[in-house]
Structures are given as C-alpha cells and as structure tokens.
Swiss-Prot record:
Substrate binds at R238, D368. It comes from Nitrobacter hamburgensis (strain DSM 10229 / NCIMB 13809 / X14). Gene3D superfamilies: 1.10.1740.110, alpha/beta hydrolase. NCBIfam families: homoserO_Ac_trn (TIGR01392), PRK00175.1 (NF001209). This is Homoserine O-acetyltransferase. Residues 63-372 form the AB hydrolase-1 domain. It is an enzyme of class 2 (transferase). The active site is at S168 (nucleophile), D334, H367.
Length: 399
C-alpha cells in the first residue's frame, strides 16, 4: 500500500481545490445559453475551459497548434505547474527553438472537460447546488472533450488549426478532431495512441477505478463534502498505471533488483527494493495534484473511445476523403499502445485516402517515451511540422 507520506498536505489539498474552480490560467466561460451537448444526452451548462497559450497568433490566424494532454496531464504544457511547482509536462517539445516552436507557432492547450485543473469536471462546484459535482457530474467521452475544445477554438476566433498534436489520451483527441472537424485540421500528429481502447487497457483502468472506490475515504465520491480524500486508493491506482507506461527493459536498467538504502532485506513489507520506493513515490506525488473522481471519469472516457463504432465498424470510413496531413508515431517498447495499433490507424488512413506518414521509433522507454528527451522523436515532429508549414505558407510568409 501507499505509505502515510502519501497523504496530501493541507496546502496542496487547498490549492488543488482552488484550481478546480479558479485556475491560475486563462479561462473561457460558457453561459447557460451556450451548452455543451454530451454524448450521454445531457447538455452541460454553464461550464468553463481552463487553458494556456504560448507564442503569438499571426495576423492570418494560420499558425495555431492545439496540444491535447494525456490522462493525467493538464493545460500547463510549458510553464511551471501551479500546484507542484515543477516544469510543464512537455517542455521538451514546446518552447522557443523546439519542435513546437513558440517563436513561430501559437500553441494552445486546454484542460479537458472532466479534468481537475480548471475546466468543469467532478471536482468543480455544481452551480445548481453550490457543492462539488462529485458523481453527479455526467459521464463524458473523448468526443465531448473535443467538442468543448472546438468551442474554445471558436471563442479564440480561429477557424482552422495548423496542427493538432497529442500522445496517449491526447492522441485519441487528435484523431477525434480529424473525424469530427476534418475541415478545421490542416495537420495532425497522433502519438502512441489508438482509434479505440483495447480490452487489456480497459482492464487496467478498471483495476485503478476499483482501487479508488475501495478506499473507505472515497465515500461514494462525496469525499470533499465529508472532509476526507481517497489518497491510498488513488495512489495505488497511479502505481499500477505507471507500470504500464514503462517497459521491462527500462525498469531493469533503472532499478534491477537493487535495494533501497540497505544491503540486506528487512524481512518486512517496507520498500526494500528501489523499484518499490519509486512506485510509492509516483503514487504519493500524484495524489497531491489530481482529483480521484476525475481519474474515474477520464479513464472511463478513454474506455468508451472507439472511432469505428460510429461508422458501422469500418474505421477507414471515418477518414474518407480527409484533407488533413497525418504523421503517426509509435514506440517499439510501448505495450500499452503497441505499434500494431498505430499500423492499424495508418492502414485505415491510407484506405480513406489520407496523406499519412508513419514512424516507429526504436526505444526501450515504453509508452511514456513521448514525454521524455528523445531526439529522434523531436526530429520527426520538427520535420513534419516544417513540411506542413511550407505547404500552408507559414515559412514563405516568414511567420
């Protein structure tokens, strides 16, 4: 189990709650007459979307890139995180002179609907009751997230996105953008993702959800009202999920069977091994910044994702006659979204007549490779965007 050190400090808990309703980022608010239609049949209104921008939008509004974050990410791509104080989660890719060059592009990232960093979700206050939504919040889907993002892009006055970029759950959003709004996406970079969640991945998510709900402090999702927090359950969920983001080779290289601050086993259930200590740290640090109910909602949204299901089971039909340029990226050691999933996406894109390139990057870093310092990946992303930019006229215009 996660040890006692995983209990969030009052300061972190208070700041996390504050960010849910009043984030330290830009906020687009949508009133009751601007509802967000959800796949479950409910119109969500009012609601808000928290977002960050980097760089400047050019006069022609042709240089906007939307970054879509993964399951446990948020809008703080390339700035210091307001809760943890750590650098943004994709500072390796976004910034001046980087593949998503903020001297050239206008980069946008919003917290997804259902998240816990300022966009409306289960951690937000329900305006009808004045209390936290909790499980009264409607179940959301990846298409719902994208629909909300499209409303934000409308609010920003942008008709067409130069590119939509994201990995994992973010990659699912990228693909959904291309299906739902093909005329609004000039280029797309879906990374380490799939067009539907596999049975294995659904099973991993259910394990995490059950860990959260088995924690007595979850209180049927009413932990905020009752002054508790399911830190143990959420910490275990994070530990289990984090294993799937890595690879056996990466774990062996980093930890092997080395002991943690000792030479001999304690013959107890302390963290004897370095890998145990590492996982406990991952669990304890996660609960300081993330809402447990949001974890339930976002994992469920990923589970429901299946592009082909809305096209009579024919994936290629979803991309038929698309004009979007694609670069699909996978990693050899990613067993959460293996290369076979990316190849299936590429085959469907080819069958639909799309312009698509595909790169499988050799690495032992697992699924999370897209978040790490990986020069080969950076080179591919950079080359793809430069090529697309030339076609769009960005380079020729000196923008």
């Amino acid at each position: 189990m996660v040890n006692a050190q995983s209990v969030p400090t009052p300061a972190h808990a208070e700041y996390r709650a504050q960010e849910a309703d009043h984030p330290t980022s830009q906020v687009a608010m949508f009133a009751g007459d601007q509802p967000l239609p959800l796949d479950c049949g409910i119109d969500l209104a009012p609601f808000q979307i928290a977002y960050q921008t980097y760089g400047e939008l050019n006069a022609g509004k042709s240089n906007a890139i939307l970054v879509c974050h993964a399951l446990t990410g948020d809008q703080h791509v390339a700035n210091v995180h307001p809760v943890t104080g750590k650098p943004g989660w994709w500072v390796t890719l976004v910034g001046p002179g980087k593949p998503l060059d903020t001297d050239k592009y206008f980069v946008i990232c919003s917290n997804v609907i259902g998240g816990c960093m300022g966009s409306t979700g289960p951690a937000s206050t329900n305006p009808a009751t004045g209390t936290v939504w909790g499980l009264d919040f409607p179940v959301i889907t990846i298409p719902d997230m994208v629909r909300a993002q499209a409303m934000l892009i409308d609010r920003l006055g942008i008709d067409t996105l130069f590119s939509v970029v994201g990995g994992s759950m973010g990659g699912m959003q990228v693909l959904q953008w291309c299906v739902a709004y093909p005329q609004r996406v000039f280029s797309a970079l879906p990374i380490a993702c799939s067009t539907r969640h596999s049975a294995q991945n659904i099973a991993f998510h259910e394990l995490g959800r059950q860990a959260v709900m088995a924690d007595p402090d979850w209180r049927d999702g009413r932990y905020v009202e009752q002054g508790t927090y399911p830190h143990r359950g959420l910490g275990v969920a994070r530990m289990a999920a984090h294993i799937t983001y890595l690879s056996d080779a990466a774990l062996h290289r980093k930890f092997g069977r080395r002991m943690q601050d000792r030479d001999l086993p304690t013959f107890s259930f302390d963290a004897d091994f370095q890998v145990e200590s590492y996982l406990r740290h991952q669990g304890s640090s996660f609960v300081e910044r993330f809402d447990a109910n949001s974890y339930l909602y976002l994992t469920r949204a990923m589970d429901y994702f299946d592009i082909a299901a809305d096209h009579n089971g024919v994936l290629a039909a979803a991309f038929r006659d698309t004009r979007t340029r694609f670069c699909v990226v996978s990693f050899t050691s990613d067993w959460l979204f293996p290369t076979s999933e990316s190849r299936a996406t590429v085959h469907a894109l080819n069958a639909g007549g799309a312009r698509v390139s595909f790169a499988e990057i050799e690495t032992d870093r697992g699924h999370d490779a897209f978040l790490l310092d990986l020069p080969e990946f950076f080179d591919i992303a950079h080359a793809f965007l430069v090529s697309a930019g030339k076609t769009r006229g960005l380079a020729a215009a000196g923008e």
